[in-house]
Amino acid sequence: MAVLKLFSFLILLGLALCESEGPTVRVANGILQGKWRESTKGRKFASFLGVPYAQPPIGENRFKEPQALKPWPGVWDASRLLSPCLQYDSVQDGIIGSEDCLFVNVHTPKPYADALLPVVIFIHGGAFMYGAGGQYDGVHMMDRDLVFVTLNYRLGPLGFLSTGDEQIPGNAGLKDQSFALKWVRDNILMFGGNPDSVTLTGCSAGGASVHYHYLSPLSRGTFHRGIAFSGSAFSSWTHSVKPVEQGKALAAIVGCSTTDTREMAECLRNRPGEVIVNGQVQMFDWNVNWFTMFTPTAEAPSVKNPFLTKYPYTASQDGDMQAVPLITSVTSEEGLYPAAAYQADPKVLPDLEARWEDLAVYIFEYNNTLPLKLRASVAQKIKDHYLDGKPVGQDTYDGLVQALGDRLFSANVGKLAQIHAQKSLQPTYVYRFSYRWQYSFSNLMARNENDYGVSHADDVILIYNYHPSDTTRPEDLQMRDTLLDMVYSYATTGVPKLPNSPTWSQVKPGQPELDYIEIAGPKNIKMKSSADFGKKLFWDSLGFTENENYSKNARDEL
């Protein structure tokens, strides 16, 4: 009996020490020690932060596909966030981060559970130029029985520069993401997660990334459903049609050869990372820049293990995709990204009006997809359609926001939903978020507290606790729980459900009307339908050489 009591005491002592020191798990490359935390509603959960999933992409590995990680000795301290990837930060207007940045963050309420939990992965946005997985905390998600994972991936030219051949194939950032998805598949069991029930989510560039993973052979079998919040690979800002031209422009800025791609690649690998990222900043066409020219692209036939070999719209129409369910979404004032930033400086809107014809090609992202002879007339058509032909200013600001939102996000999110439903024959859902809560991403960009509407990413910030941001208003808390219920029901059953709402109808394959659910409040949720979601008919009429009008020959005529 005494021996039994001693044995029990030692077990309890061991558990107590484990609790005080933080949770530990063993993954393929070694032992991790995280930390215990408390969720929004007081639930205990474990966080494992700054967990490496690939070798640092430095030196000879810069621009290359991610390389397998070697085992580490001892115990890896996973109790704190590590560096974001090297980037230009639009908010801080400076360069931050490190090239040694390929980390995941794993949050789990039951690291030692017998019953495996569904997994939700979130890919951060930031125009493929800035951001980090650690900016999105698991504190709200941990009120549900699921495992939540965020990740870093290479950004800007370090993640997406391409020489158009095997020297620098491009898409390194997307290959990082795919490598991280495989890491989750192979290791998430050790955190109590179910590798056979993975929901891939992301917002903005992260939402477009989700779409890209549906199209990439590298990511096949790594997830089972997805949510593309406010992002589509059909949007022009998410895909480069002139990657070599842009790569050479950057090489010239940092003093590298542009005549031979081998020499160019070698030179770029030996330039300091900060110099390369700063070179990108020098390429900006306007002083208010929230998008980068270094984005995903189709890779050359000579590239081994390509992420993408077809133009996204072509791949989708060919049905060359992972056939699993999909949710897409928009907010009611998507165009506040980037238009909210125009409010931070009183000189911006007058400058935009004075140079409308020149700047419209950049803010609406058609510099590389519209022939020169059409640019003046298209700029005027946009102003006529959305601003009634009036000057850009505070009086027409709302129209400018809608124009930017429809062009950069909504029209192509709707197009993604309809094509996915038709080609995959899998359940496809759309929602539109129009509830203004206490915090808005637009306030961060505008640097004021004005109510401009429901910004791009406001729904995601509420769910995933960006930065972090929080609210105490009862209706906001109810709205957050409603969105969390949506994600949780979808992650567990494959069917999204919203409390206090009608049945969420799927997108009907082959139909011109797009069915979507409008989320205007926790108790104001309704089904709606539109044959012109995001005013796609107007945007499709302007002659952009994109999507259904894309051809390689057209690229050379611009």
Could you describe each region identified by the protein language model?
Residues A2-V3, L12-L174, P195, E299, ...:
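Non-catalytic accessory segments of hydrolases
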Residues V3-L12, S90-A265, N270, V288, ...:
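Serine-hydrolase-like catalytic core of hydrolytic proteins
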Residues A46, E99-L102, K175-S178, K182, ...:
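A structural signal for well-ordered alpha-helical segments within the folded catalytic domains
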Residues F48, E99-F103, P118, A323-V324, ...:
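Extracellular structured ligand-interaction cores
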Residues T108-L117, I188-S197, S257-T261, Q394, ...:
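Surface-exposed helix-capping loop/turn segments at secondary-structure junctions
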Residues T201-A205, Y431-Y439, P502-Q511:
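Short, solvent-exposed turn/loop segments enriched in Gly/Ser/Thr/Pro and often Arg
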Residues P217, S230, V254, P272, ...:
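Sec/Tat-exported extracytoplasmic proteins
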Residues C267, G273-L477, M486, T493, ...:
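Substrate-gating cap/lid region and adjacent catalytic-acid/histidine neighborhood
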